[in-house]
Amino acid sequence: MSIKLIAVDMDGTFLSDQKTYNRERFMAQYQQMKAQGIRFVVASGNQYYQLISFFPEIANEIAFVAENGGWVVSEGKDVFNGELSKDAFTTVVEHLLTRPEVEIIACGKNSAYTLKKYDDAMKTVAEMYYHRLEYVDNFDNLEDIFFKFGLNLSDELIPQVQKALHEAIGDIMVP
């Protein structure tokens, strides 16, 4: 049996702790994969635009499973968009806004969106992971295809917030 595809996660797997990789070595390995007919796939919860920034030379040759599977692109062409309906998006946002301990990033195809009112520390972290990020006054009337939400909250609150979100919106999304 021969290898047909190699898929890698980025953070903590393909990338070093400094969010880099040995490009020269990888490009040599990639050329070997191509010669053997092996597809290379980047799979990550990260934004598509961040992922392609790591592979500018070959972004239109490889596949990306971005946004935790919400957006799949192969050889520069959309394969899948896990679009939330407008009603589902609104329901989720309305619920998340009732939780002041949660800072929200709405992840869309054109951009990610977060609120202007959030503090600079949160914005700095968000900018590391979202190459396209817009600051908005609210989440009303955003025109985009939305895949998921990124949430920022303190680690000790995660179990209780996750449980509460599952109960409140688990029929729409898996928290």
Q: Which positions does each model-derived feature cover?
A:
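An N-terminal domain-start capping segment
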Residues: 11-21, 89-90, 124-128
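Active-site phosphate-binding/coordination module
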Residues: 24-122
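Conserved acidic, metal-coordinating active-site core of Asp-based
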Residues: 95, 101-103, 107-175
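Short, contiguous strand/loop micro-motifs
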Residues: 16-17, 79-80, 148
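Short, basic/glycine-rich phosphate-binding loops at helix/coil junctions
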Residues: 8, 71-74, 140-144
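Short, small/polar residue-rich loop motifs at catalytic or cofactor-binding pockets
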Residues: 1-2, 59
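Asp-based phosphoryl-transfer active-site loop
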Residues: 2-19, 44
